[in-house]
Amino acid sequence: MKIRASVRKICENCRLIRRRRRVMVVCSNPKHKQKQG
């Protein structure tokens, strides 16, 4: 899980979602997981 100021999709499998007022990226590749904070 990477915590970044700006999250973005890295590949076509990445999906932007909102959980508990935070923007997150979930993907089939665990390296692409990101959280905004």
Swiss-Prot record:
Alphabetic keyword roster: Chloroplast, Plastid, Ribonucleoprotein, Ribosomal protein
Ranges in coiled-coil conformation: none
GO BP term, pick one: translation
GO molecular function annotations of the record: structural constituent of ribosome
Gene Ontology cellular component terms for the protein in this record: chloroplast; ribonucleoprotein complex; ribosome
Compartments where found: Plastid, Chloroplast
Major site of localization recorded for this protein: plastid
Family statement: Belongs to the bacterial ribosomal protein bL36 family.
HAMAP family tied to this protein: Ribosomal_bL36
UniProt name for this protein: Large ribosomal subunit protein bL36c
